[in-house]
Design a protein with these regions (language model features):
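Bacterial N-terminal signal peptides that target proteins for export
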Residues: 1-10
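PRPP-associated nucleotide enzymes
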Residues: 13
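C-terminal motif of bacterial Sec signal peptides marking the signal peptidase cleavage site
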Residues: 18-20
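Periplasmic c-type cytochrome electron-transfer domains
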Residues: 22-481
Length: 481
């Protein structure tokens, strides 16, 4: 029985045993007897107002939350999976780790001919972030998007001889497109109290390209982001995201988040983009098929043409799809049903103070703390959940410091989709290091904050003006996520 329900039996018992109030007579009231004792009117019982249950801020992913602070925190199944649904998740887990090899082969055949990596897990180790670029080495989980222009309706225009992604590896006997190298500049910035911090600025260079780079080549570096929680983000109703948008800054708060509208390669329709660092993918299915296609050179029914089409590396064999629809479906379900790590230390006074500061300096204007998912029949485990992702899934101008100057559909060269912050405090535990932002340049959360510009410049300057104790509290809050 609910704590808010009245017991009928108890109410009757109470009525039978109550004495006459204010009469000085302790004799029981008799109901329906012959004694002639008057029956006193029953005092109306006012129903209690139900109390809304207190929100448990630990439950970042609602019913999909996992209570793990280990290195496996990002790769744990949602706890509300069971039976055949859990089996399907585990099948997707196997496919996520499968390594593709050069054709012909009995399994996982069709790698390349040019590619960046050979499996999902190598770009997303432990289902988390990839590694930032390192000078003078073969890059493992960072790549360059390339193009020579952009049509807001149809998207980036492929670079002749290089397509839409620079692929630095190739199968035996085939020439890769070249190599990517990086150098870092250290830029010192100072807080109002005199403390300093060094910001690492990457400068990427294409070397040993197999042919001359085309004039006007646009490039943008991408480090693979974490993959957990994406099913919940996919289940946020489009109306909710549109309600967060404020493209013309009608409320005059300096924040003008807007949506990206991109072509769905399955239907051909233009739809809301919500995945990818510039919100250029309409669904997880499309994003995953795109990763097979561009990152691994593996074709599918969604992207049936080799990524090297029109180049000297093109494989002219008329192969069937190299990854099956079933595998794409299983990998998509796997990503949709990964659990979200629980928040920690939610009642700690320092964390609570940092949470208040997070709102006060208006970080929460873009990193919206909570959302509710809608109906999602394909994956009911993520439907109708109160979640705490800290994102609005919108594009925001982040200023020239973070700009790659490569537009993508409606996204300008300085706009980025707000990344979710859930789980960010466990990054070092899972990945063994801290590297943040779209290209992994930030080695700490404070570095990431101080790179914010554009719409976030005012918030950054408010953080700069904080005393060290307040900055520490802000970081304590972020570490609790």
């Amino acid at each position: 029985m609910s704590m808010y329900s009245l017991s009928i039996a108890g109410l009757l018992a109470t009525t039978l045993l109550l004495g006459a109030c204010g009469s000085g007579n302790s004799s029981p009231i008799v109901i329906g007897g012959d004694t002639g004792t008057p029956v006193e009117p029953e005092t109306p019982v006012q129903p209690e107002t139900p109390v809304e249950p207190e929100v448990d801020k630990r439950l970042s992913g609602g019913d999909t939350t996992v209570f793990s602070e280990s290195s496996s925190a990002f790769e744990t199944p949602a706890p509300n999976l069971e039976g055949e649904r859990l089996d399907k998740h585990l099948a997707g887990d196997v496919a996520f780790e499968d390594v593709f090899v050069t054709a012909p082969a009995p399994v996982n055949s069709g790698l390349g001919t040019i590619f960046n990596n050979s499996s999902c897990i190598r770009c997303h180790p432990r289902d988390g972030r990839g590694r930032a670029a390192e000078p003078g080495v073969d890059q493992e989980s960072i790549f360059l998007r390339v193009s020579i222009g952009n049509d807001p309706l149809t998207g980036p225009e492929p670079a002749p001889g290089f397509g839409l992604q620079f692929q630095h590896r190739a199968v035996f006997g085939v020439e890769p497109e070249g190599k990517v190298d990086v150098a870092y500049e250290e830029l010192e910035t100072t807080f109002a109290d005199g403390d300093t911090i060094s910001l690492r600025k990457p400068v990427f260079t294409i070397v040993e390209s197999y042919q001359p780079l085309p004039p006007g080549l646009l490039t943008g570096a991408r480090v693979a982001p974490p993959v957990f929680g994406r099913g919940l983000l996919e289940a946020i109703p489009e109306a909710t995201i549109l309600g967060w948008a404020d493209e013309l800054d009608d409320d005059n708060d300096g924040i003008s988040g807007r949506t990206n509208r991109v072509v769905d390669p399955i239907s051909g329709a233009t739809r809301l983009g919500r995945f990818g660092l510039k919100a250029n993918a309409v669904s997880l299915e499309v994003q995953n098929a795109g990763a097979y296609h561009e990152d691994m050179g593996v074709t599918s029914s969604i992207f049936p043409v080799e990524s090297s089409f029109g180049q000297t590396q093109y494989d002219e064999l008329l192969d069937e799809a190299e990854v099956s629809d079933e595998t794409i479906e299983n990998v998509t379900f796997y990503v949709q049903t990964l659990g979200v790590p629980a928040r920690r230390d939610v009642d700690d006074s320092e964390v609570l103070r940092g949470e208040a500061l997070f709102t006060e300096v208006r970080c929460a204007a873009c990193h919206i703390p909570q959302a509710r998912t809608g109906d999602f029949p394909a994956v009911p485990e993520v439907a109708n959940q109160l979640i705490f992702p800290f994102t609005d899934l919108l594009l925001h101008d982040m200023g020239e410091g973070l700009a790659d100057n490569r537009p993508d559909f409606l996204a300008s060269g300085s706009e980025w989709r707000t990344p979710p912050l859930w789980g960010i405090g466990l990054t070092a535990v899972v990945q063994g290091r801290n590297e943040f932002l779209h290209d992994g340049r930030a080695r700490s959360l404070m570095e990431a904050i101080m790179w914010h510009g554009g719409e976030a410049e005012e918030s950054r300057e408010l953080v700069r003006a904080m005393p060290a104790a307040d900055r520490d509290a802000l970081l304590a809050f972020l570490q609790s996520l």
